[in-house]
């Protein structure tokens, strides 16, 4: 399956990496690499993430990496990465539609 990153997800990963880089640029780079590795695993195991509790829709799922939720939608021939959020943040509905 093909992985597609939404503009919001790209903005979020950039914001988070910049925040981490304030204290440790190397940690920010490692964080980005690990997020991409986690997402790549979805190509083989798209249903490995849990259903997003707030939405309760089978096709919208999340995987957890550290303190972050990587939220994605399973589509016919692709997986769309919708957003990335800290686990303590409220999930804005606009980011998952």
Report each predicted region and the residues it spans.
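Basic, Lys/Arg-enriched alpha-helical interface segments
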Residues: 2-59
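Short acidic-hydrophobic surface loop/beta-edge motif
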Residues: 61-63
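Enriched for short, Lys/Arg-rich terminal
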Residues: 65-68, 73-97
